[in-house]
Regions:
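Proteins enriched for Cys/Gly/acidic motifs involved in redox and nucleic-acid/cofactor modification
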Residues: 1-155
Length: 155
């Protein structure tokens, strides 16, 4: 017989199941990349949610200037703490920081389930249980107001 505390815990976990929280840090290129990822996830019928609602977290990092690297590392550490507390089940890191410092990050933060670079979208999708849909190349879910959007010129 489950006591009330266990029942509440199970109910909370089941509500969070397979919901992806995408945290985007850094520049407009990362916003664009996150919008493309959301478009791919939607096409795969994956549920992208806001912060506290997800049990799977993807952190899209920036790694070019010191403050951005610091913000990215601190955000990853916060998510690792949530994972260790059982608040999230999986943690993935993508973006510039992961691209540039992957070996160091894997060594220093092994609690992250996987690290992906800026061109690893198909591999990230596979880790999230989704397929890369070539026909959606460039399609995305915009997160900006309708009167403007980011356009990615280069990597």
């Amino acid at each position: 017989m489950l006591n009330q505390t266990n029942r509440n815990t199970l109910r909370t976990k089941s509500r969070k199941q397979n919901k992806i929280n995408l945290i985007t840090l850094g520049c407009s290129k990362n916003i664009y990349d996150s919008e493309v990822l959301m478009g791919q996830l939607k096409a795969n019928k994956k549920n992208v949610v806001h912060e506290e609602e997800g049990n799977i977290v993807v952190v899209n990092t920036c790694g070019f200037i010191h403050n951005a690297r610091e913000e990215s590392v601190n955000t990853i550490l916060e998510q690792i703490q949530k994972k260790e507390l059982g608040d999230i089940d999986q943690l993935f890191v993508t973006g510039c920081l992961s691209e540039r410092y992957k070996p160091d990050l894997e060594k220093e933060m092994p609690q992250v389930d996987a690290y992906f670079g800026t061109t690893d979208l198909p591999q990230l999708l596979k880790a999230l249980g989704a397929d890369y849909k070539h026909e959606l190349l460039g399609d995305r879910i915009t997160t900006t107001p309708k009167n403007y959007a980011y356009f990615k010129v280069s990597e």
